[in-house]
Curated annotation (Swiss-Prot):
Could be a mediator in iron transactions between iron acquisition and iron-requiring processes, such as synthesis and/or repair of Fe-S clusters in biosynthetic enzymes. It comes from Pseudomonas aeruginosa (strain ATCC 15692 / DSM 22644 / CIP 104116 / JCM 14847 / LMG 12228 / 1C / PRS 101 / PAO1). One of its GO terms (cellular component) is cytosol. This is Probable Fe(2+)-trafficking protein. Keywords: Iron.
Amino acid sequence: MSRTVMCRKYHEELPGLDRPPYPGAKGEDIYNNVSRKAWDEWQKHQTMLINERRLNMMNAEDRKFLQQEMDKFLSGEDYAKADGYVPPSA
């Protein structure tokens, strides 16, 4: 049986991550408060932001921007989107 967490983004009990995605306090916070669903969605969105905005992960400013957007995304706040992106309709 997988562990569940009260997801910060979706405000409901959902399956959690298998292990912290980062070392330290930030990783523990995500592990304890973010669902697998929200984390998987963030990883897809992160890839889109890196590609569309041509972010360079060697650049400290780009890493800081991505970290801030991750915090917003996982907290259910308004976050940066790729220019011109239209999500697929269900």
